[in-house]
């Protein structure tokens, strides 16, 4: 099999049909998997010596949440170092990053792998990976044909990153600096709530407005603050953190505004406060609702006039600080109850942001679980950490009152328990490794099978044939989508369909 002009044109057309970058990336990966008849494909973005998945097909959903650091993945490091197509032999000693992450093939290791580094000029911006369960799966494709695919993918990714850079810097195309991948705090999640939050972060980051970030404990409010700072014009200056809930009343004013020598017992020298440290940068005040009313009044003055006074000093100091505040309380209710100043609330909430709880984020829980699994793999020196189907089902049906923080701790604990029950450096997390309160899981759906006079083989094939027909109908005869619904490999599905007479 080889590429024709029609095949390449079809890939290019699919890229143009996409609505937005993410849709184009997914169309590219899905089309490539169909054309190459491979078992899995992925588009990865390169940033700070790690590959970040942008789109996948044929891989477990949690792969989208993983961050593949080069030092922990020698195959990906080889792709990053190469300037051309990389083919890994079936007996390669380098472990494949996707071993155990192809649904329905968890117990098998990937046999065939091709890596295509993607460049914008001389800069590495990403990679395409193609994987198959057959050792000779990609032998029929020449390096030149694969280079054409890489060029199409590199063009799509390069354009997306350049547009992202221009938008983040509020520049016109003619003002663009030399291409450089935009570095931002990674906020993992594709749910509607997180997608909207990311858009709002992009909007407010370019301004100098104060921001009030609200959300339940453990939702990631500090990560939102970091994302705002890193995407703002103040990113070259410090982001200073202060947890207001951990401040004893006796030292709170000094922590915020500093003090001079002799201002109080123990003040043996002059000391800068958080506002001075954050001058020309950003100050993140976590748990702002815990500040006393007296301190709220002094904070309000800083926001109004831009100057501070160290404790024990009559002189004022000018500061240029952007304030980001976070709370897990309803500050409107706190204002009505007299525990929070209304004028300070309005000063802080010029641009309010709300971080959704994990229970409202759908499949984001699986992406985040993948991220934490990869963290555990690196920290504990394991070759792989994967979630079983039962574990994924459990995570999707647990409410996580502690939100993302609870999920992180649950994954770390589960890895420790799983390691204790099996030898070796490969860990599979099962449902029993999670110590959640009782979770009611939906019963598996079992299709009714009519009673017919058939032997077991004929009945099995009839059931398979009807199941595939229904899945195809529900997915508009898209074989890749059908395979995902049936949780099987698309190449295996094609072979089964041919055997059952559903495909020529």
From Swiss-Prot:
GO terms for biological process: phosphorelay signal transduction system. Pfam families: GAF (PF01590), Sigma54_activat (PF00158). Residues 479-498 bind DNA. Signal peptide: none annotated. Keywords: ATP-binding, DNA-binding, Nucleotide-binding, Phosphoprotein, Transcription, Transcription regulation. GO terms for molecular function: ATP binding; ATP hydrolysis activity; DNA binding; DNA-binding transcription factor activity. Residues 187-416 form the Sigma-54 factor interaction domain. Pathway: Nitrogen metabolism; nitric oxide reduction. ATP binds at residues 215-222, 278-287. The modification 4-aspartylphosphate is found at residue 57. PANTHER family: ANAEROBIC NITRIC OXIDE REDUCTASE TRANSCRIPTION REGULATOR NORR, TRANSCRIPTIONAL REGULATORY PROTEIN. Required for the expression of anaerobic nitric oxide (NO) reductase, acts as a transcriptional activator for at least the norVW operon. Activation also requires sigma-54. This is Anaerobic nitric oxide reductase transcription regulator NorR. It comes from Escherichia coli O157:H7. The lineage of its organism: Bacteria, Pseudomonadati, Pseudomonadota, Gammaproteobacteria, Enterobacterales. The gene is norR.
